[in-house]
Amino acid sequence: MRTLQKLTGLRLPEKTVFWLVLAVLVLMLAPMLLVAQYNVPCADDYHFGAPTHAAWQATHSLASVVQAACGKVAERYVNWQGTYSAMFLMALQPAVFGNGFYALVPFLTLGALAAGTCFFCLSLFTRLLGTGRWQALVLALVWLGIDTQLLPSAVQGFYWYNGAVFYTFFFGVQLFYFGVLARYLAAGQA
């Protein structure tokens, strides 16, 4: 935070800077989340979600839905490619349970991205590089702002479930993994 002080002449506590940056990020994300209510399934959502939707309509059993998702993965194993964990999640797209649930897609993907980014930054910067917690969180929020605002296609990255789960959600999961690696490396240095 000394750099901020040098650039602006302001001397703000790190916690205050965090809350200011968080407020800016919330303002940036608010329009993205407000339009989520208009989000509807499209394209591959129907293909991957058809068996699970049929299972839900017939039984209203989560076990049957998961079984249908596993069946979709098995079908793709024989006929297509090897992104099985992604295909399992694609078969569980929210509209399987009703079109109104599709509005949750940007919340799920942004949530995974935000959680992964914050965990990674906290792990890397505080555990491995020795910075303060508030500094690491400010870096995470700035990174999250850049990720969300400069994405080439917000529709494919946050709103279209199959694209968002395949890329954005798994990127968030990957950041968790890198955070665990950073913590592992930091524990080895002790």
Regions found by a protein language model. Give the residues of each.
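Membrane-interfacial loop-to-transmembrane alpha-helix junctions, especially the N-terminal start
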Residues: E14-W19, Y77, L128-A140, A190
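Start-transfer (signal-anchor) and selected internal transmembrane alpha helices
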Residues: M1-L29
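Transmembrane alpha-helices of multi-pass, membrane-embedded glycan-processing enzymes
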Residues: M90-Q93, V105-T117, F166, F170-V173
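Transmembrane-helix motifs of polytopic, lipid-linked glycan transferases
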Residues: L108-R133, F176
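Short hydrophobic alpha-helices at membrane interfaces in multi-pass membrane enzymes
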Residues: R183-A190
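Short hydrophobic/aromatic helix or loop-helix immediately within or flanking a transmembrane segment
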Residues: A74-F107
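Extracytoplasmic loop-helix module adjacent to an early transmembrane segment
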Residues: A30-W80, M90-L92
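Membrane-interface micro-motifs in multi-pass membrane enzymes
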Residues: D44, G132-R183
